[in-house]
């Protein structure tokens, strides 16, 4: 009886350990996508005003108002889109949308073009960050929610911190347009990672 009881206790403990195991292989791609997203977004928040001034545009602050509208609007419809199309597919599509928006920001010649691109850029950024946070919490054991939130904020903060320094150096040597081209390239890396993850784990 004692032996049987000990075996059952060990079995329950093993099951609990399995439940609390974190599968970092499936989590690493959303974390990296968030990092690249923050890296690129730091280029926008830090340098789009200076970029607009260098092009002779007035009222560059309007960019951030339109950008914020895009971010807010994504919160209202992303949940329905994720349910309909799938988590990773929407992560992929928003990374692609952010790539197109940021690349075209590097091509603008008129202020209205910059304002037009602020909306999809804001939508993509506003969609990716909450998705990754929710994904991490859902995929980690309930007892590890603290790790999920810490990982989320670490990826975001590191992206912004590195971006602010790196983009400043690039701007000094290559100009503002190059910042946005390279920022867009970061999103292509995210797209490739999403495609690989979807294929390996057959995710939607």
Segments (PLM) and residue ranges:
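C-terminal membrane-cytosol helix-exit motif in multi-pass small-molecule transporters
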Residues: 1-12, 193-198
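Intracellular juxtamembrane helix-capping segments at the cytosolic ends
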Residues: 127-140
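Paired small-residue
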Residues: 101, 112-120
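Extracytoplasmic gate region of multi-pass secondary transporters
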Residues: 26-64, 71
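Loop-to-transmembrane helix entry/capping segments in MFS-fold secondary transporters
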Residues: 142-152
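Helix-to-loop junctions at the C-terminal end of transmembrane segments
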Residues: 74-87, 171-172
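A membrane-interface helix-boundary motif in multi-pass transporters
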Residues: 169-187
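Structural signature of the two symmetry-related core transmembrane helices
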Residues: 89-104, 184
């Amino acid at each position: 009886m004692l032996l049987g009881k000990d075996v059952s206790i060990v079995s329950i403990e093993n099951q609990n350990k399995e439940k609390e195991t974190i599968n970092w292989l499936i989590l690493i791609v959303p974390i990296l996508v968030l990092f690249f997203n923050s890296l690129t977004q730091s280029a926008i928040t830090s340098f789009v005003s200076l970029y607009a001034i260098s092009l002779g545009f007035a009222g560059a602050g309007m960019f951030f108002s339109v950008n914020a509208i895009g971010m807010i609007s994504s919160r209202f419809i992303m949940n329905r889109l994720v349910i309909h199309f799938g988590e990773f597919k929407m992560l992929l599509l928003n990374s692609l949308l952010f790539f197109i928006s940021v690349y075209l920001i590097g091509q603008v010649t008129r202020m209205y073009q910059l304002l037009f691109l602020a909306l999809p850029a804001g939508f993509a950024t506003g969609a990716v960050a909450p998705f990754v946070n929710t994904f991490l919490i859902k995929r980690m054991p309930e007892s590890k929610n603290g790790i999920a939130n810490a990982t989320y904020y670490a990826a975001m903060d590191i992206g912004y911190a590195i971006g602010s320094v790196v983009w400043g150096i690039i701007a000094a040597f290559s100009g503002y347009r190059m910042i946005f081209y390279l920022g867009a390239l970061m999103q292509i890396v995210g797209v490739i990672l999403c495609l690989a993850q979807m294929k390996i784990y057959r995710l939607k």
